Amino acid sequence: MKKILEKIVNIVYWTVTTGFILFLVYWILQITTTCSFHTPSGSMTPTLLPDESGLVNKWKMGARIFNIFDAAEGRPYEIRRLPGYGRLERGDVIVFNYPYQDRKDSIAMNLGLYYCKRAVGIPGDTLEIIDGFYHVRGCLDTLGVASEQRMLQEYMQEQEQHEPDISRWRSWMRFYPKDPQLNWTIKDMGPMLIPEVNTEIELDRKNWLLYRRYIEWETGRKLQWRDSVTVMDGKPLKTYRFKENYCFAAGDHAIDSRDSRYFGLVPEKFIVGVAGILWKTKDGKRRFRAIK
């Protein structure tokens, strides 16, 4: 009887120990190496189809380390990255936390909502949309999927013929921040500078409209436009030097994708990682292919 009890205890001990080690390894891999993501919509068609899943590569940019409990409870927290083997590149398919929580005018990392889009603009780029197509100054490469942008171009040209007055276009056709001074649309916008660390800008009315939310997120202070002057803490602010990197994230299915055209730039710290391989799909020929 004693030997049987010892055997049972031994089995239970090793089962619990093995289970704990496997659980620990799983979470270490989740934090430092990879995790799964799901595409519920067709916003990344044809690269990713609805109801497909892939793995995130966290090694390229380096895995993020932060206090998830402080983040969940709204307390101040710092995001750091482990060393990676590369950096964000133009054209990378990325997975990131949606940059808003309850308030749509205040940048905050949303822990419960993840997006998968393509980084068509990276820190330091000057981005434009010309007749529906993405362009970065100094870059001759095709950004995104040209056939999808052509589809958007044709649709918007029809809209333009039907209603030449841009101010009367429907909301989904208007570009962030949807201000009449800019009058930008998803057909034509820019140029827009995508800030990187140490980028310095003049705080005129246009830049106040474009970058107010990011400056407020970086400083924790309100930035106001008062009497034709940008004001912070009651004092005029003529210029600002950014402390963080940002990117412009866009869905490949340009005619139907909620992305940076509508909610603005994504702080680089909100990026979980770069999309790696596709592991769940109804098309067996696509399974385990690299996501590009």
Where are the language model's segments positioned?
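Juxtamembrane cytosolic face of transmembrane helices
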Residues: 34-37
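Hydrophobic membrane-insertion alpha-helices, especially the h-region
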Residues: 10-32
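Soluble "head" domains of membrane/secretory-pathway proteins
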Residues: 2-9, 13, 43-292
